[in-house]
Amino acid sequence: MLLNRLRENLDFSHIYGHHLNFFFKSKSFQLEPIIKKKLFPKIELGDFVIKLADKKSELNKAQALRYSIFYKEKKAKSTFQKKITRLDYDKIDKFADHLIVIDKKRRGIKNKVVGTYRLIRGDIASRFGGFYTSSEFDLTNILNSYNHKKILELGRSCVHKDYRNGTIMNLLWKAIAEYIKLYDIKVLLGCAIFQGTNVQKLSKELSYLRSNFSLPDEISVKSLVNSNYPVYNRNNLNESGLRIFVKLPPLIKGYLRVGGRVSDGFFIDYDFNTIDLCVVVQTENIDKKYKNKFLN
């Protein structure tokens, strides 16, 4: 019963124009008015529905999936409130769009959310405190180079462990492509991660990425902390580039395949037990194969 009460209070009801009562305090506060969204098409393929969450129950299901993966599976450090509610949430959730994939026929669970991505456009982020990525990386060059309305941050990507055969991530990217076209997005950015915080173990991978996938100077991105560790060593590149590439995390490989580039440095996130890179994709530079597959 306590869990249900907490979930009801932590429902981000301000998304629907109400007040938020936080945990045991009766204090409520007025939130920013909601910015009207453009109509986003709901995509149905077989048993799956891909859409933007537009109900508090859908958002809570996405947050529950995130919690199960980031905190239970990946062992991120949880706060007391998150342990009680079993939801992953932060202040950015209240102004972001939440892309979800629903399995309509998952046995025993109606309308199960099995995949999610959080989307934040630059004009929205600038009104509510900025991108999540800007808490780890200096995005000045990108913000100075693009109309903020044309920048889209991707984050909080996760897929249920029973659905990691590539299908759900493909569906999410189909929907992201629709979002890109709808809002005429010119650049994608976000944090892509290596699990763990031991930099030395990743010396080959980090050296390979810096040597082969660095951003051009005019939109270069720097870590907010000094991450020029001695791991960046060309001697680490004796191993075949292909052999290093195939060992990269799937999400990083995916971004690189479509034409992404990475930040000059990295950020160690001890709370999430990750080493983060900022990945940037200029949509005009998306590889032709993927542009034909998703954007045409």
Which residues fall in each region the model found?
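Short amphipathic alpha-helix that is part of the acyltransferase structural core
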Residues: 38-114, 118-123
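C-terminal "cap" of GNAT-fold acetyltransferases
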Residues: 273-285
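Conserved N-terminal entry element of GNAT/NAT acetyltransferase domains
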Residues: 4-56
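Short loop segments at secondary-structure junctions
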Residues: 104-106, 123, 162-163, 283-286
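Basic, polyanion-binding surface patches
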Residues: 292
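Acyl-donor binding region in acyl/amide transferases
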Residues: 119-261, 266-275
